[in-house]
Amino acid sequence: MANEITWRLEHEKIGRLLLHYAMPAVIGTMVNALYNIVDRIFIGQGVGPLAMAGLTLTFPILLFLQAFGMLIGAGAATRVSIYLGRRENEMAEKVLGNAFTLTFIITLATVVPCMIWMKDLLLAFGGSEQTIPYAQDYLNIVVPGTLLTSLSFGFNAVMRASGYPKKAMFTMLIGAITNVILDPIFIFWLDMGIKGAAIATIISMLLCTLFVMNHFVQKDSIVRFHKGTFKLEKHVVWNILTIGVSPFALSLIRISEPT
């Protein structure tokens, strides 16, 4: 499989390669948007307008946390692609392992403050006594699960960049379809309201993460996890962050945009 991917990148026409890699990426981005759309539909119908207002309050916090996932995921995906193009597979695997460790560290460093000052942040975003409880119910479940979000989306980008765009797309589809199935079960059937929507999201992210992580331990993957690659190396971390900082900054700008 690895040799086939390398051959395609070296010999196929640029236009065909662009289509091969771009279309699954576009579909994956649309699928990503489904998480928010589906949650809004079911929460609006099953819980009510105050819950919808509470859900809207959560977006700046969630976008902030997702920006750090973008910082690592986009940077790692690009670096892996560069090293594979140079036939430096060992360096590509170092990037993979360092990105995994870095995701854990940065997630912990951002999630803990968000949990501690959650109510203060929601008040700053214009929350009221009526809407903040809904926002807290959602965030108390979703924020601790940020690690799953960062791993699933970030390493999905690495999977795509390393030559598996269709597999990356199907992995995202699995998560989105699971979310669509579980939302009505938890919100309506189990009568868990906005908490049910949060649980459905986390379960779908867990499933997506398991599929992505499983890919990088398979023998047919062009880059794989190895014990020696998880130890952080300054130059590897620097290489990841210098590329990831641009999409990270753009993600932060989105938070300040009026909705």
What residues fall within each predicted segment?
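Residue-level detector of conserved catalytic or cofactor/ligand-binding positions
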Residues: S251-I253, E257-T259
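Helix-loop interface residues and adjacent transmembrane-helix termini in multi-pass membrane transporters
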Residues: I37, G46-P49, Y83-R86, A161-S162, ...
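Short alpha-helical transmembrane segments in multi-pass integral membrane proteins
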Residues: M1-A22, V80-G145, W189-G244
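Small-residue-rich hydrophobic transmembrane alpha-helices
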Residues: M52-V112, T149-A168
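Hydrophobic transmembrane alpha-helices of multi-pass small-molecule transporters
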Residues: F64-A67, V111, N179-P184, T209-M213
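Alpha-helical transmembrane segments of multi-pass membrane transporters/permeases
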Residues: T103, V158-L182, I199-I202
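Residue-level signal for short hydrophobic patches within transmembrane helices
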Residues: G15-L34, V38, I61-F68, P144, ...
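Hydrophobic/aromatic residues in alpha-helical transmembrane segments
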Residues: M23, D39, A76, W117-M118, ...
